[in-house]
Amino acid sequence: MRLQQLNLFFLLLCVAKANGSLLPFMDPPITLLADLWSDRFPDPFRVLEHIPFGVDKDEASMAMSPARVDWKETPEGHVIMLDVPGLKREEIKVEVEENRVLRVSGERKKEEEKKGDHWHRVERSYGKFWRQFRLPQNVDLDSVKAKLENGVLTLTLDKLSPGKIKGPRVVSIAGEDHQQGNLNNDGAKQEL
């Protein structure tokens, strides 16, 4: 008797695997839970496709997101890479300030709208962006090189030799018994 039950079970299992099932179809419990969840909480990404949003194209809402950056230090210097897809050389500005700040800015111009155009989707951003970086003391500010290739702006900054790195300057404080002006460590007067 036990052997007949096993044979019947085996037969039903084989038929079920062959897509000619004699057994009623039942979802696994996890699928039933997922269906219950999806009925109560629809996929937020699919919902957004069906809501009739107007396309808001004002400059404040379409400001460019900041450029993504990778910055690495090598034995020879520093390399900063920024993603600026679709921008031309003329649309990007690289500045180095005396306070050791490197600033990269740019602007993607808004595409001209022609009469009769109907926008279905606007995802690319336009407008201005800027990123700035405080450079370490070992960077030679006069050695900054920039190269734009395949939408990636690569900035290369050489390192100063250890003997050329300027440390903080000590300023003497004058009191009642000292002359007016600032003195350096040698006692000589210097301009600030």
From Swiss-Prot:
Name of this chain's protein: 22.0 kDa class IV heat shock protein
All residue ranges annotated as the sHSP domain in the record: 58-176
Family: Belongs to the small heat shock protein (HSP20) family.
Subunit architecture: Forms oligomeric structures.
Keyword Nucleotide-binding on entry: no
Main location: endoplasmic reticulum
GO MF entry, a single one: unfolded protein binding
Family annotation (InterPro entries): A-crystallin/Hsp20_dom (IPR002068), CS_dom (IPR007052), HSP20-like_chaperone (IPR008978), Small_HSP (IPR031107)
Pfam families: HSP20
CDD domains found in the cross-reference section: ACD_ScHsp26_like
Subcellular location: Endoplasmic reticulum lumen
Keywords from the UniProt entry: Endoplasmic reticulum, Signal, Stress response
Motif (Prevents secretion from ER): 189-192
Gene Ontology CC: one annotated term: endoplasmic reticulum lumen
Organism: Glycine max (Soybean)
Signal peptide segment: 1-20
GO annotation, biological process: protein complex oligomerization; protein folding; response to heat; response to hydrogen peroxide; response to salt stress
Keyword flag Signal: yes
Source organism, top-level taxon: Eukaryota
